[in-house]
Amino acid sequence: MGRGRVQLKRIENKINRQVTFSKRRAGLMKKAHEISVLCDAEVALVVFSHKGKLFEYSTDSCMEKILERYERYSYAERQLIAPESDSNTNWSMEYNRLKAKIELLERNQRHYLGEDLQAMSPKELQNLEQQLDTALKHIRSRKNQLMYDSINELQRKEKAIQEQNSMLSKQIKERENVLRAQQEQWDEQNHGHNMPPPPPPQQHQIQHPYMLSHQPSPFLNMGGLYQEEDQMAMRRNDLDLSLEPVYNCNLGCFAA
């Protein structure tokens, strides 16, 4: 006898229902992975348990991209099928879409922070680990790039400061050389053109009135000769005549 068709219905026993859910969920995840690998298809699988726990599978961990693509496709189809649909319905669908996207982002954020990991399968944990490793590599690469750019900027500023210091030092040396050359030129001019010493100040001597009265005052006659010698000779003759009797008297006294 052949095996009859098993009727599908809800399992009443909670333990059996939980075991069956775990087995079927694992098989479903395996089938989704197989079809994505064998057929090169983009697969997104979302499963909620009866307790509200979320289980998902996505090709290459791109659940958000697949869901956004699905939303665009379904929205375009709805626009083609019912172009005159009510605007309220469109707003309601848009609200539900954004709400689901926000919930997905919040859940991924909790996973990135290491929260709510109990409901994740080993495959999901592996995908999360790969995502974190990739993100960590990007972060380290960006940090290293910023540090490298900062070092290059500091080196550029240092080089500019060194060039400025060199230019200032060169200008200072050139200025010192110019001043030194000017000083040497001034020294050579002073040594080469020595001025005679200034004359000493004149001393005012007090002279006797007799000397002043008898000081010769030469004058020029018509012939261009001075009469100083004639006047001096006349004065000596007068002096000899006046002193001769005195000398004779004294000599007579000594003879007696």
From Swiss-Prot:
Induction notes from the record: By cold shock (e.g. from 22/17 to 16/12 degrees Celsius in light/night respectively).
UniProt-listed InterPro entries: MADS-box/MEF2_TF (IPR050142), MEF2-like_N (IPR033896), TF_Kbox (IPR002487), TF_MADSbox (IPR002100), TF_MADSbox_sf (IPR036879)
GO terms of biological process kind: cell differentiation; flower development; positive regulation of transcription by RNA polymerase II
Cross-referenced SMART domains: MADS (SM00432)
UniProt cross-references to PROSITE patterns, sorted A to Z: K_BOX (PS51297), MADS_BOX_1 (PS00350), MADS_BOX_2 (PS50066)
Location in the cell: Nucleus
Subunit architecture: Homodimer capable of binding to CArG-box sequences.
Protein purpose: Transcription factor that promotes early floral meristem identity in synergy with LEAFY. Displays a redundant function with CAULIFLOWER in the up-regulation of LEAFY. Required subsequently for the transition of an inflorescence meristem into a floral meristem, and for the normal development of sepals and petals in flowers. Regulates positively B class homeotic proteins.
Name this protein carries in UniProt: Floral homeotic protein APETALA 1 A
